[in-house]
Amino acid sequence: MMYLTYYFIEITIFLAILCTIFIISAKNPMVSILYMIALFVIAAMYLYLIGLGIFSLLYIMIYIGAIAVLFLFIITLLDINSTELSVKSNIRDLPLVLISLIVLTISGLMIYSNDSILINKLLEAFGNDYNTIITQDWFNIENTTLLTTIGNVLLTNNAFILLVLAIVLLLGIIGPISITMKHKE
């Protein structure tokens, strides 16, 4: 059963990369938005498969429910016939996307490797708070509320994923603003 989960994780990673390429190479902005929604669903499936069910639900609610609807609203305001983009202009950005993907992959591997010098230096600089995690009374259920439990899980075990989601949300906010800005020519 465990191998089947790893197999599905590999499939979701491959589908996410494929959807990203389709987003970049789509000629019509509406088709690009549909691929982006598919990418959000695939990312939510990936988060569920690695054991982060609450993050997958939050990802679907925030990104598909809010950001994608906002993008669809902005794109419906644009004149689709005049905004048809050539595939060459989108493919031109592919090296930048690949470089960004490589940098994010290397940084993720550095963070999750046990013998990373960078992470050890950061822990020394900001203080090693593993003692507070270990000394926390995790089995005292009577005094723990749901908000406290979610806060402990978000800010201790999954802080990196929370930061990545915040950066993606920031990019999702900046995107519609840059689309609707009128450039002086």
Swiss-Prot record:
Membrane disposition: Multi-pass membrane protein
Catalytic activity: a ubiquinone + NADH + 5 H(+)(in) = a ubiquinol + NAD(+) + 4 H(+)(out)
GO molecular function, one term: NADH dehydrogenase (ubiquinone) activity
Pfam family, one: Oxidored_q3
Protein location: Mitochondrion membrane
Transmembrane portions of the chain: 4-24, 33-53, 54-74, 94-114, 159-179
EC number, as in UniProt: 7.1.1.2
InterPro entries (alphabetical): NADH_UbQ/plastoQ_OxRdtase_su6 (IPR001457), Nuo/plastoQ_OxRdtase_6_NuoJ (IPR042106)
Keywords: Electron transport, Membrane, Mitochondrion, NAD, Respiratory chain, Translocase, Transmembrane, Transmembrane helix, Transport, Ubiquinone
GO cellular component: mitochondrial membrane
Coiled-coil regions listed: none
Top-rank taxon: Eukaryota
Family: Belongs to the complex I subunit 6 family.
Function: Core subunit of the mitochondrial membrane respiratory chain NADH dehydrogenase (Complex I) that is believed to belong to the minimal assembly required for catalysis. Complex I functions in the transfer of electrons from NADH to the respiratory chain. The immediate electron acceptor for the enzyme is believed to be ubiquinone.
Subunit structure and binding partners: Complex I is composed of 37 different subunits.
Name assigned to this protein: NADH-ubiquinone oxidoreductase chain 6
Species this protein is from: Yarrowia lipolytica (strain CLIB 122 / E 150) (Yeast)
Phylogenetic placement of the source organism: Eukaryota, Fungi, Dikarya, Ascomycota, Saccharomycotina
Gene: ND6
